[in-house]
Swiss-Prot record:
Domain of life, source organism: Bacteria
UniProt-annotated binding residues for ATP: 12-15, 55, 59, 162-163, 168, 171
Cited function: Catalyzes the reversible phosphorylation of UMP to UDP.
Gene Ontology MF annotations: ATP binding; UMP kinase activity
Protein name: Uridylate kinase
Length: 238
């Protein structure tokens, strides 16, 4: 078995993926499978923080299109990510894994507040850190949150888990001629307008010299495979 490429990473999970085969809510078998994957990665000696999206509950942009202000819609979406983080924390703990949910919002009755010190301490204690609440500010995506938190906690890479095995020149589900890239620079990802992450996330990763690895999480063990350098995906770096 190959040695892990990185020792501390941030994994970005979409809220939509947590819904599993459903269009809304949390699919427990899917959450349990992700928890198993994260536990297996931790056993490789890798420190893991996970940023979860909220699209299975609320998407701020969609809510704002229905008359709610964008700032309010985004706040609703960020609160949805807290619910998802609690679901993942519970699944990990139920399987015997040390895990803690940290929120960008102050909600002491629900979970701990994210601070750099709290995250560093939890990782040093061997806990899987699940990050909810986005950045705590509207207008920023959870992709940008993942890069921001990675920079804050000194992670070596961001793993963007998606439903496709990398970055393509076009949507491979719609265009059979779409080309998959093995590697892109941050600037190429921004200039290409690839929709796998937003430009702000790529720009922050470029500024902080953080590689982003885009891969499919569809198969069990995909996160570990990518971290051992054995998986199929796109590396965005440089």
């Amino acid at each position: 078995m190959a040695e892990p490429v990185y020792r501390r990473v941030v994994v970005k999970l979409s809220g939509e993926y947590l819904a599993g085969p459903h269009s809304f809510g949390i699919d427990q078998p899917t959450v349990d499978r992700i928890a198993d994957d994260l536990i297996a990665v931790q056993k490789l000696g890798i420190e893991i923080a996970v940023v979860v999206g909220g699209g299975n509950m609320v998407r701020g942009v969609e809510v704002s299109s229905q008359g709610v202000s964008r700032a309010t819609g985004d706040t609703m979406g960020m609160l949805a990510t807290v619910m998802n983080s609690l679901a993942l924390e519970a699944a990990l703990q139920r399987k015997g894994a040390p895990a803690v949910a940290l929120s960008a919002f102050v909600m002491p009755q629900v979970c701990e507040l994210f601070t750099r010190a709290a995250a560093h301490r939890a990782l040093a204690e061997g806990r899987i850190v699940v990050l909810g609440g986005g950045t705590g500010n509207p207008y920023f995506t959870t992709d940008t949150t993942a890069v921001l938190r990675a920079a804050e906690i000194g992670a070596q890479a961001v793993l963007k888990a998606t439903n496709v095995d990398g970055v393509y020149s076009a949507d491979p589900k719609k265009d059979p001629a779409a080309k998959r890239f093995d590697r892109l620079t941050h600037s190429q990802a921004i200039e290409g307008g690839y929709k796998v992450m937003d430009a702000t996330a790529f720009a922050l990763a470029r500024e902080t010299s953080l590689p982003i690895i885009v891969f499919s999480i569809a198969e069990p063990g995909a996160i570990g495979a990518m971290l051992r350098g054995e998986g199929r995906g796109t590396i965005v770096a440089g």
